Structure formats: structure tokens, C-alpha cells
Swiss-Prot record:
Glycosylation sites per record: 27, 61
Stretches assigned to the Cytoplasmic side: 112-117, 179-232, 293-414
Domain remark from Swiss-Prot or TrEMBL: The VTT domain was previously called the SNARE-assoc domain. As there is no evidence that this domain associates with SNARE proteins, it was renamed as VMP1, TMEM41, and TVP38 (VTT) domain.
Compositionally biased residues, Low complexity: 12-24
Coiled-coil residue windows: none
Chain's gene name: tvp38
Name listed for the protein in its UniProt record: Golgi apparatus membrane protein tvp38
Keywords attached to this entry: Glycoprotein, Golgi apparatus, Membrane, Transmembrane, Transmembrane helix
Main localization (coarse): Golgi
Positions on the Lumenal side per record topology: 1-90, 139-155, 254-271
Source organism of the structure: Aspergillus oryzae (strain ATCC 42149 / RIB 40) (Yellow koji mold)
Length: 414
């Protein structure tokens, strides 16, 4: 009866057990984009851009967690060595500050005499020049001393000229010494190769931004020299363009001398103006360096994304047409960097796994005789069986003792 059939079908369609919530393991079985879609469709959590304070605290928390994870992985003696190194660095920093203060106290009586001395000017210029080579330090201190002895403009010219020439020479020497290291990095490190490409196509602008960043001076000279796409003249030009920032230490040095020589004669207001000018100048320099650093990192990531997109399109086009990848640039340094990124992109796209259509079966006669199928055909052996071939492939046995064959797979280049 139809009525009984309908009621029976409805009864069978009911669940035999109450519905249960999915376990975490069941949730993990769903594809990841389903979670993303549900997250986007939830109106209870509107997307809001985090404030600067939240970004800073989040970054500090991430850094502290990363440092704690590294610390927990260290052995006992590694922890002892790390603690000793941190203590030594703090002691050296305090000692350097004390030494710098003693230098200005010692320079007080002789600053007026040395201001017109050519020998003092030359010696200080050479000091700035030589601290350009890593791992020497004291570049900022010499800039302040230049302003302390020779005033703002004369001290700035000394500081700027020695900085430009010193950084260029340091760049050339570091590149010569670190050439083997550069080659290894270009072939193995995809991040290094990406930054090398960004410096090639947006070189001068990005170099100027790097020179404005608050990075260790001599170490920066050696680090940038490892990028083969940066030329020495371009690096020297970028350093010369940003020399106006060197007015900051020269100005601070001149204000320190003014306060030390005429501090007793100044009124409280004049002292306050000079001290505030020093603080404001230093604060502007720090803020500018931090801002430029953030912009530099953002620009580097943007250029790297563009380079990767171009390489990805080239790889996809070559793979679709089944043709080999040609060189990316006539410049060998650029081509090496692009090839390193191309290998990384191939792994991401899955092109490193060759399909069966690109694999040929070749049987090479290891005896090297004239009857080798490879020698007769002039290329790899390919199976060309047809439906009409009904011979038993096992009827001839294993063959003679001298007929030994090697089985290899060859990947077609075309």
C-alpha cells in the first residue's frame, strides 16, 4: 500500500542516534578554505586594523617567545656562553660610553688649537675613512668629534667626504674577500637571491633607503658588498646622496662644545635651548631611521613579490608549452639569483615532479657493441608496440650471456 510505504520510508530516514558535535579531528578533515569562508562570514568579529601600540606589543611578545624557545633548546654550556657574551657586550657598551665622555673632556683644552690645524683635520679624516672597514666601530663618535672640533659645516664636510670614500673602498675590499661566500649564498639562499634581484632593478632608491637606516656602519658596508647586483659606484652614489643626515652628529658635537666652553656664561634659557636642540635632533634622527627602515623592508618585500610573480609566469608558460627554461637575464649575477628563485617557485608550483609524458624509456647496451639499439637508432629506445604484435615476449628466453642491458629513464628536454 502506498500509505504504508510512505510511512516506512519516513521512519527509515530518521537518524538512529542523536546528532553530536564534530570532534576537532573531524573539523581538521575539512579543507582549509572552508574555515576561511566561515571566518569571513562571521559578522561578530569585524576586521579592525590594530593600533600601533598593539603592533609593538605583539612584536615584542613574538620576539620574547622566539628567544625563550631558542634558550630552551640550548645546552648548559651554550647557555653559559650566551650569558657571558651578553654580559661582555653590556660591559663593552658601558666602557665605550665612558671612553667617549673622556674623549670630549680631553678634547676640551685642545679643540681651539686643533680647529685650524691641517694635521688634525687629516688625522681625523683618516680615522673616519678606516672605521668604514668591518668590523671596526666608532664611526658615529668620530662624526660628533668632527663637529666638536671644526664646527657644523667644516666638520660635516670632513665627515661626509671620508664616509663616501671609505664606504666605497670598504665595499670593493669586502667584495673581493667575500667573493666565495657570495657565490655560495646566491646559489643556496633564496632570500639572499630575492634581495639581490630587488637591488638590481630598484637599486639606487633602495640603497639610499638602506643607507638611511640605523644600521651598523662598517657592517652595513660589508653586508651590502655581498650582493653582486650592486655596483661600487652605485653604492658610493647612494652614500653621497644621503650625506645630509651626517649633519646630525656634527650639529650635536658643535652644541656640546658650546655648552662645555660657554656653559657658565649662558643663561638658563640658552642652556635649555641648546640641550633641547640636541635632544630633538637625536630624536628626529632616530625616528627617521626607524621610519625609513620600515619603508625599506616593505619595499623589499614588494619588489620580491613582483620578481617572483614574473618568474612564476615564465615557468608556467614554459611548462604549458613543454619547452626548457631559458636564462632569465644576460647578466650572470642576475641569472644566478633568478634561477635560485625559480627553483623555489618550481617546488611551490609542483613542477619538480615530472609526469609520465616527459619520461622516455631507454635501454642501453652496456656491452657497448655495434648492435646496441641506442647506437643504431641514434637516440633513446621507445616502445612502439601495436595491436598486431601478438608474439610472445618470453619465447626467446633471457638471451645470451653477453647481451646484458641496462634500464634507465631519460627526461626529454623538449
Amino acid at each position: 500500500m502506498p500509505a504504508d510505504y510512505t510511512s516506512t520510508a519516513r521512519a527509515l530516514s530518521l537518524p538512529t542516534s542523536p546528532s553530536e558535535s564534530l570532534s576537532p579531528a573531524d573539523n581538521d578533515s575539512y579543507p582549509p578554505w572552508s574555515h576561511l569562508a566561515s571566518g569571513r562570514s562571521n559578522p561578530a568579529h569585524p576586521s579592525e586594523r590594530p593600533t600601533l601600540w598593539k603592533q609593538v606589543t605583539h612584536r615584542l611578545n613574538e620576539t620574547s617567545q622566539r628567544m625563550m624557545a631558542i634558550w630552551r633548546r640550548l645546552s648548559f654550556w651554550q647557555k653559559v656562553g650566551a650569558a657571558a657574551a651578553a654580559l661582555l657586550a653590556n660591559l663593552l657598551g658601558i666602557g665605550f660610553l665612558v671612553f667617549t665622555g673622556k674623549v670630549f673632556i680631553w678634547l676640551g683644552p685642545v679643540a681651539e688649537q686643533w680647529e685650524q690645524s691641517v694635521v688634525a683635520y687629516t688625522v681625523l679624516w683618516l680615522c673616519v675613512f678606516f672605521v668604514s672597514f668591518p668590523p671596526l666601530v666608532g664611526w658615529s663618535t668620530f662624526g660628533t668629534i668632527s663637529g666638536y672640533i671644526f664646527g657644523v659645516w667644516k666638520g660635516w664636510f670632513l665627515y661626509a667626504s671620508a664616509t663616501v670614500l671609505g664606504s666605497t673602498c670598504s665595499f670593493v675590499v669586502s667584495r673581493t674577500i667575500l667573493s666565495k661566500f657570495v657565490n655560495r649564498m646566491m646559489e643556496r639562499d633564496k632570500r639572499f637571491a630575492a634581495l639581490a634581484l630587488t637591488l638590481k632593478y630598484d637599486g639606487l632608491k633602495l640603497l639610499c633607503m638602506i643607507r638611511l637606516c640605523p644600521l651598523p656602519y662598517s657592517v652595513c658596508n660589508g653586508a651590502v658588498s655581498t650582493f653582486p647586483t650592486v655596483q661600487p659606484l652605485m653604492y658610493g652614489l647612494a652614500t653621497a646622496i644621503v650625506t645630509p643626515k651626517l649633519l646630525v652628529p656634527a650639529f650635536v658635537g658643535s652644541r656640546i662644545r658650546l655648552l662645555s666652553e660657554k656653559g657658565e656664561e649662558m643663561s638658563a634659557g640658552s642652556k635649555a635651548v641648546n640641550i633641547i636642540s640636541i635632544i630633538v635632533t637625536v630624536a628626529i634622527g632616530i625616528f627617521t631611521g626607524w621610519y625609513i627602515y620600515k619603508r625599506t623592508m616593505a619595499r623589499a618585500k614588494e619588489l620580491e613579490a613582483q620578481e617572483r610573480a614574473d618568474i612564476r609566469r615564465s615557468l608556467q608558460a614554459d611548462h604549458a608549452d613543454r619547452r626548457p627554461h631559458h636564462s632569465f637575464s644576460e647578466d650572470p649575477d642576475v641569472n644566478t639569483a633568478a634561477t635560485t628563485l625559480a627553483r623555489d617557485e618550481e617546488e611551490r608550483l609542483g613542477f619538480h615532479d615530472f609526469d609520465d609524458d616527459n619520461v622516455d624509456l631507454a635501454i642501453d647496451d652496456e656491452s657497448g657493441g655495434e648492435n646496441s639499439p641506442r647506437l643504431q637508432s641514434g637516440g633513446p629506445y621507445r616502445d612502439e608496440f601495436t595491436d598486431n604484435d601478438s608474439d610472445d615476449v618470453f619465447k626467446n628466453g633471457d638471451g645470451g650471456e653477453g647481451e646484458t642491458y641496462g634500464l634507465h629513464t631519460h627526461v626529454r628536454k623538449s
